[in-house]
């Protein structure tokens, strides 16, 4: 009965006060907070040092530490990013740690097509060394910039499954302001596990490709 009378008096006088033994901060500073806000704040404050953790410090260290790139032997090549024949995104730098050969080819180049006939066999022959053979198709048979359909067709025509095909354009070439030097078709760029351009071969020679890859995997 006394509790009910106290409640009625409280409501009539608008003078209800929290008991001194309640768990509360300054209510005036929290009057705009929802119960969820207060609960979240209390939870975060219980995590000692949580605000001192840099989330980027939890990420693995990137092996890509250089600021410049070029098509010069002994330097780091510039990154190439493009979808492959499966429409998966290929990134050259994402393959850090693998020996890589880039085959810059065109659809109107006879020796380029001869190289394409053996690309999958080369890929399989060096699979134990984790070599990656990537054809960068610069132009189609009619000289156009290749689209996704052209990339897929090239892969199907030459039965390329583990050997990748990506699309490029002349914008990649030094002659058009790009980083890759090219003076003949096809041109092969050999990149070691540390993403260093080690050798450049111009023209197609099956024995030369095998020789260059046998040397590359020893680095």
PLM segments and residue spans:
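Thiol-/selenol-based redox modules, centered on thioredoxin-like
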Residues: 183-219
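A short beta-strand-turn-helix
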Residues: 79-100, 126
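Conserved helix-turn-beta segment immediately C-terminal to the redox Cys motif
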Residues: 98-99, 114-137, 156
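Sec-dependent signal peptide recognition
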Residues: 2-10
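Conserved redox-active cysteine motifs that mediate thiol-disulfide chemistry
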Residues: 104-121, 143
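Short, internal strand/loop/helix patches
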Residues: 134, 149-193
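N-terminal targeting signals for export/organelle localization
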Residues: 11, 16-81
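Short pre-active-site segment immediately N-terminal to redox-active cysteine/selenocysteine motifs
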Residues: 97-100, 104-108, 140, 184
């Amino acid at each position: 009965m006394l509790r009910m009378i106290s409640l009625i008096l409280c409501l009539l006088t608008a003078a209800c006060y929290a008991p001194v033994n309640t768990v509360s901060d300054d209510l005036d500073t929290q009057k705009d907070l929802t119960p969820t806000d207060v609960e979240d704040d209390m939870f975060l404050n219980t995590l000692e040092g949580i605000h001192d953790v840099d989330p980027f410090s939890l990420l693995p260290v990137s092996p890509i530490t250089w600021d410049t790139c070029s098509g010069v032997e002994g330097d780091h090549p510039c990154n190439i990013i493009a979808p492959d024949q499966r429409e998966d995104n290929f990134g050259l730098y994402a393959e850090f740690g693998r020996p890589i050969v880039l085959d810059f080819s065109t659809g109107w180049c006879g020796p380029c097509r001869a190289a394409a006939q053996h690309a999958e066999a080369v890929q399989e022959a060096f699979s134990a060394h984790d070599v990656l053979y990537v054809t960068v198709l610069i132009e189609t048979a009619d000289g156009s910039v290749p689209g996704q359909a052209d990339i897929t067709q090239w892969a199907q025509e030459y039965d390329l499954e583990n050997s990748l095909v990506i699309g490029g354009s002349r914008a990649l070439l030094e002659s058009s302001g790009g980083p890759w030097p090219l003076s003949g078709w096809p041109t092969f760029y050999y990149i070691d596990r540390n993403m260093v351009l080690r050798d450049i071969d111009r023209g197609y020679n099956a024995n030369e490709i095998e020789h260059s890859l046998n040397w590359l995997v020893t680095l």
